[in-house]
């Protein structure tokens, strides 16, 4: 289907299979397009399911979407103020992209859950400022894949479902831009050297209410590279076997650990900050064993308020 013009509507109820480079299932050049994909979509080997070039587009993917292979994309939009509603599941592998948006003020509502695996695979990719992503279903990211990636300022990502990240190079939520906000209401489980939340930019805020489990060397629950970061860990955090719960590289960071923090094992760290004028408020209890570190700060003028009590046992535990 190839439409040039504004205010086009496509109702695709029968499902769609698109394969090979330059193959496109639905192509619209124009503003205010609406596409309803009610059937299941299977995109592979460099094909594109739905492509829209224009502002104020809306794509409703009510069926399940499977994307596999380098250059393959389920939904691709170039334009501002676009909306993608992913009610069906999203399964991305082999370096494909599930949803790819270039433009400001994009909104993605992902209710169906997301599975992303393999290097270069991305579930949701947005290049533009003021993006909003709502992940209401559970997300499983592995083997070098990325769940949600936003390149732009003032991004907001709400992870209401549970997030599981496993493997080197795997990332649940990745943002490059200033004034980013991530709300992690579901649980966050990171292992095998993956990163749960990875933000590069100043004035980032992470509200982690769902609790966090991080295990294995190089695994990091929350990683922020930038100044004036704020992290609120309201749920319980369990860090073990060389993992790191929260790591901030930048000045004037504030980390509020309101839940219980348990750290066990050599190389394991609950909260790690490299920067000056850092503040850590430990209101929940802190339990450190096996040679782990509860709070580790490198920098001048650091402040730690430990109100929750502390239990430290075993050699090298701090």
Language-model-detected regions and their locations in the chain:
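Thr-biased low-complexity repeat/linker tracts and other Thr-enriched repetitive architectures
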Residues: 1-318
């Amino acid at each position: 289907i190839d439409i040039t013009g504004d205010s086009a509507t496509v109702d695709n109820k029968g499902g769609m299979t698109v394969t090979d480079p330059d193959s496109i299932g639905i192509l619209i050049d124009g503003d205010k397009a609406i596409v309803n994909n009610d059937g299941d979509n299977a995109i592979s080997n460099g094909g594109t399911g739905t492509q829209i070039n224009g502002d104020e587009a809306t794509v409703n993917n009510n069926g399940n979407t499977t994307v596999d292979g380098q250059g393959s994309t389920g939904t691709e939009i170039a334009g501002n103020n676009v909306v993608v509603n992913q009610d069906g599941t999203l399964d991305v592998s082999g370096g494909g992209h599930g949803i790819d948006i270039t433009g400001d003020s994009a909104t993605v509502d992902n209710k169906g859950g997301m599975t992303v695996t393999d290097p270069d695979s991305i579930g949701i990719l947005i290049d533009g400022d003021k993006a909003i992503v709502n992940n209401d279903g559970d997300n499983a990211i592995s083997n070098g894949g990325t769940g949600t990636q936003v390149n732009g300022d003032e991004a907001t990502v709400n992870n209401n479902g549970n997030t599981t990240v496993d493997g080197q190079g795997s990332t649940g939520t990745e943002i490059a831009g200033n004034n980013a906000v991530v709300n992690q209401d579901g649980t966050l489980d990171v292992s095998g050297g993956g990163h749960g939340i990875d933000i590069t930019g100043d004035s980032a805020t992470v509200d982690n209410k769902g609790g966090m489990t991080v295990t294995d060397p190089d695994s990091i629950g929350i990683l922020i590279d930038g100044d004036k970061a704020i992290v609120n860990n309201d749920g319980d955090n369990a860090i073990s076997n060389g993992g790191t719960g929260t790591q901030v590289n930048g000045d004037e960071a504030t980390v509020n650990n309101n839940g219980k923090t348990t750290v066990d094992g050599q190389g394991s760290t609950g909260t790690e900050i490299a920067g000056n004028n850092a503040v850590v408020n430990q209101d929940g209890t802190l339990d450190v064993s096996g040679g782990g570190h509860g709070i580790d700060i490198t920098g001048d003028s650091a402040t730690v308020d430990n109100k929750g009590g502390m239990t430290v046992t075993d050699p090298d535990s701090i």
